[in-house]
Amino acid sequence: MAPALSPTRSHHVAVIGAGPAGLVAARELRREGHSVVVFEKQKQVGGTWIYTDEVESDPLSVDPTRSVVHSSVYRSLRINGTRECTGYRDFPFVVRSGVSRDRRRFPSHGEVLAYLKDFAKEFGIEEMVRFETEVVKVSPAAEEGIGKWRIESTEKEKKVRRDEIYDAVVVCNGHYVEPRLAQIPGISSWPGKEMHSHNYRIPEPFRDKVAVLIGNSSSAEDISRDIARVAKEVHVACRSNPADTFIKQTGYNNLWTHSMIESVHEDGSVVYQNGKTISVDIIMHCTGYKYHFPFLDTNGIVTVDDNRVGPLYKDVFPPAFAPWLSFIGIPWQVLPFPMFELQSKWIAGVLSGRIPLPSKEDMMIEIKTFYSTLEVQGIPKRYTHRMGNTQFEYDNWLASQCGCSETEEWRKEMCLANGVRKEAHPETYRDEWDDHHLVSEAYQDFSLYS
């Protein structure tokens, strides 16, 4: 075990992004006694939860010269986890007063944004944020001393470029901006329209069209039903489905689930692995996103390879730069806000010297062992950061490092019950449930923070 930093030492820390991860990072860093500056490109807090009707000029979002739109939120989006599970651990996502608030248990994106603004107001986060300021480069500043970082940023309105030195950098820029695309044989000569779900907002452009959605994520599930209200036909293709899959969705006359696309052709047809051939107008990729840190220059030490960000100890610290560079929010298939909170507490405590880290050598050994385990299990590199059922073990490990209580039993049970309900009743799980006893347990805990 490497020695901790000087006890209760305060550092000048830059946080990149004022979304859900950046907000709680700023709070925890300041609580630990650090001096914090948050860089945010947009005019307000909220990150990807800030809805906009704007979409990118390139519907596939591959043109490097395009004007990037940060949000991937579509107009009809409602959260797919319960309100109780979604919120930060010590700032519950409860129904608040206000005529414009969404009181549903699975509220809209607008309610999540309002919650994040409530959080920022409650803890005075905005006073730490430089809005409309884009970080263009983050790089080690070795000439300034061990662990120092140079941040180059530009302010949109003032057109001011700053070059500043920080002791540490916490990266919280989200990962719902740079789309991943499916590889489809014949796509270069297919005459129809392609797009990524990042640029989906409303169903109207799909009226009377035949659309194919690729993917099995929550977004594919929700958007396919949204579009089916106006489209002629909607076909959902997924590579994880058996090759003979062809299922008409209950309650719809125009929505089908297929196996993956085998090929597309110049006549506009799409051929599936199940043998079906359909003439299609639009293909939408609901295929997720790439981790993307265009501002980060580490001379190749921290890389993104097939969507593996590495090397990272516990998905947070790159050993070569620990603890002066860290990442929040890399794992997926998790309850994000509670995880962000625990990661933030850990980072803040490590930086202050209160919590020790292993040596760089020991961190690298653990990372390599983890990578080897994934390889032996046949798990693709792109799933390195997928947690799913292991998320609570991870959260509890973080909690043990920080001296916090473990994940509440009600939160674990509620999350698992919601997953079962969602799979069995994708149409109604947001509005019909039977876990009232867990809701009562949650609100008993929430009373501690009211």
From Swiss-Prot:
Keyword field contains Translocase: no
Under the heading InterPro entries, the entry gives: FAD/NAD-bd_sf, Flavin_mOase, Flavin_mOase-like, FMO-like
A single Gene Ontology MF term assigned here is: NADP binding
The alphabetized UniProt keywords are:
FAD, Flavoprotein, Monooxygenase, NADP, Oxidoreductase
Return the broad EC class.
Answer: oxidoreductase
Binding residues for NADP(+): 215-220
Q: Which residues bind FAD?
A: 17-22
* E.C. number(s) listed in UniProt: 1.8.-.-
Q: May I ask which residue range the UniProt record assigns to the signal sequence? A: none
Give coiled-coil spans as residue ranges: none
Tell me which cofactor or cofactors this protein depends on.
Answer: FAD
Instruction: Tell me which family the UniProt entry assigns to this protein.
Output: Belongs to the FMO family.
**In UniProt terms, what function does this protein have?**
Catalyzes the conversion of methylthioalkyl glucosinolates of any chain length into methylsulfinylalkyl glucosinolates.
Q: What protein name is recorded for this chain?
A: Flavin-containing monooxygenase FMO GS-OX-like 5
Q: State the species of origin.
A: Arabidopsis thaliana
